[in-house]
Each structure stands twice: as structure tokens, then as C-alpha cells.
A protein has these predicted regions:
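Metabolite-binding pocket within alpha/beta catalytic cores that recognizes anionic/polar moieties
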Residues: 1-141, 145-149
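Flexible, glycine/charged-enriched surface loops at secondary-structure junctions
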Residues: 50-55, 159-165, 253-259
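Non-catalytic positions within long, well-ordered alpha-helices that form the structural scaffold/packing
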Residues: 93-94, 185, 204
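Short acidic/polar active-site loop segments enriched in Thr and Asp
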Residues: 98-99, 190, 209
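Active-site rim beta-loop-alpha module in soluble metabolic enzymes
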Residues: 138-186
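Zn-dependent metallopeptidase/amidohydrolase metal-coordination segment
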Residues: 197-234
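His/Asp/Glu-rich mid-to-C-terminal helical/loop segments that flank catalytic regions of hydrolases
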Residues: 222-259
Length: 259
């Protein structure tokens, strides 16, 4: 199969550092959010200043600098789906990013996970294509190998319950059939999203630290689909508070570097 043809050669015909150059004083940590409405809310709340841009056929995508608790961070809106998400962060890394903290929603495969509940993935099922260009073929990839303890302490400090487990990364959300969901649950999956496996593989390949956490949205562990808070306007205040947890983790990482 083509997906088994992993090539470890890092020098491609087109390399990200051909397109993007280092940005002076670029923050070490990039915090990224998928929801456009939520992203703009947080940028405005933290008084973000544009420091760079990426460009593609869909338009111009600003990179912002924000300050949270006296620490500087970059903010960038994540793109939906593994190829777009990975490609955009390939553009960001040459600017100077050393780690990425990614926040997004997910569908749950376990109905006991509450709406907007926090999920920390520990491994991802690689049911997409992008990760196979960055890592040898396998069904799973371990994710969040660093900073889990730090994030758990953030959640406990702020009184957020959470679950940990396997996520299913897929390319085709309209092909989440009942039989496929059952098989992924047998593999241990408790939720489904579209980017985690590929982002971890790319960051491993590029030597970049990566941490992703999810908040539960629609419920697929049911005879029919239950969208719950999947809408970008639903429970927005709760999601804003969840988004700030990413910055709490980023601060904890920065403070740990100073110890």
C-alpha cells in the first residue's frame, strides 16, 4: 500500500523554510484554536497584535502575539482537517515556534463524557493519510508524551474533571458509520477528531513539542447523532474558559523553564 512508503528524508523539493523565514522575537509557544469565533474572542480578550502571516488560496491567516500573566505567546487559528492543519503549522515552525498547544472539540464515542468535558488524548488511531508522510506506518501513535502531568495539575487547580484515553483521528466525518464506530471503540477510542495523529507525527518529525487537549461536543455513542454543543455559538462562555486553560498550561511550561 502507498501509505507504507514512509520516506525519512527531511530535505523535500519544497521545504517550509523556503517560504517562511524566522520572525524576530517570535514566542516559543503557539496556542492554537480551531473555532474561529472562539479564536477571535480570545485574541480580542488578550489584546492580540499581528506579528506575522501565512498565505494560501483561502486567504491570509494572521499570527498574533498575546500576553497572558506576563508571558508572551503566539496565537494562530488552526485549520480543519489533517492536511490543512499540518501544512499551516509547517509554515509557522520556521518563524521560530518551539512548541504547539492545540485546542479543539471532538465527537464522543462514550456517552458518559459530558458535553464540554475535557479529554486528554494519550494515543491516536491513525485513520487519516497525513501522518504517514511523517512517521512509519502503524495503527496508533502515542500523543502528548510531555506535559500531561502539568496539564492535569492545571485542571485540578481550576476544578475541571477530565478523562484520558485514545482518540480516533479520521479524514472523513461523513463516513463515521455505526460499524466503524464500533470497531474504533474496540480499539479503545473514546472520541473522534481530524488532526491529532497527524499533528503529533509532524511535530515528532520536526522536533517540535506538541500538546493537544479536546473538549467534548457531539455524541456519536447513540442510535442517532446528537450535536449537543457542536455549534460555534453554543456554550461559548464555557468554551472561552476552557480555552484559557491552554494559556495556563503555557505559563506553567514557561515558569518550569525558569526553575
Amino acid at each position: 500500500m502507498l501509505l507504507t512508503e514512509f520516506d525519512c528524508e527531511k530535505n523535500a523539493v519544497i521545504n517550509p523554510d523556503i517560504i517562511h523565514k524566522p520572525v524576530e522575537n517570535f514566542p516559543d509557544t503557539v496556542v492554537s484554536i480551531f473555532s474561529n469565533r472562539l479564536f477571535q474572542k480570545i485574541v480580542d480578550f488578550l489584546g492580540g497584535t499581528e506579528i506575522a502571516q501565512t498565505h494560501d488560496v483561502d486567504g491570509i491567516w494572521p499570527v498574533y502575539e498575546v500576553t497572558y500573566q506576563n508571558h508572551r505567546f503566539a496565537m494562530y487559528k488552526a485549520r480543519l482537517g489533517a492536511p490543512a492543519c499540518v501544512g499551516c503549522f509547517e509554515d509557522i515552525i520556521p518563524m521560530g515556534a518551539k512548541r504547539i498547544i492545540l485546542l479543539g472539540n471532538c465527537g464522543v464515542l462514550d456517552r458518559s463524557i459530558e458535553d464540554c468535558g475535557i479529554i486528554i488524548p494519550t494515543r491516536a488511531i491513525r485513520d487519516e493519510g497525513t501522518s504517514y508522510h511523517y512517521a512509519p506506518a502503524s495503527d496508533f501513535i502515542d500523543v502528548n508524551r510531555k506535559y500531561v502531568d502539568e496539564f492535569r495539575s492545571v485542571l485540578e487547580k481550576h476544578g475541571y474533571p477530565y478523562v484520558m484515553g485514545t482518540t480516533w483521528t479520521t479524514d472523513a466525518f461523513y463516513r463515521e458509520t455505526h460499524s466503524k464506530i464500533a470497531r474504533r471503540k474496540e480499539m479503545g477510542a473514546i472520541c473522534v477528531e481530524m488532526e491529532c495523529a497527524a499533528m503529533q507525527a509532524m511535530c515528532d518529525f520536526r522536533g517540535i513539542e506538541f500538546f493537544q487537549f479536546l473538549y467534548a461536543a457531539d455524541n456519536l455513542d447513540h442510535s442517532s447523532w446528537d450535536p449537543r454543543s457542536l455549534s460555534g455559538t453554543s456554550r461559548l462562555e464555557d468554551k472561552e474558559k476552557i480555552a484559557l486553560l491552554a494559556f495556563e498550561l503555557a505559563c506553567k511550561i514557561e515558569e518550569g523553564k525558569l526553575c
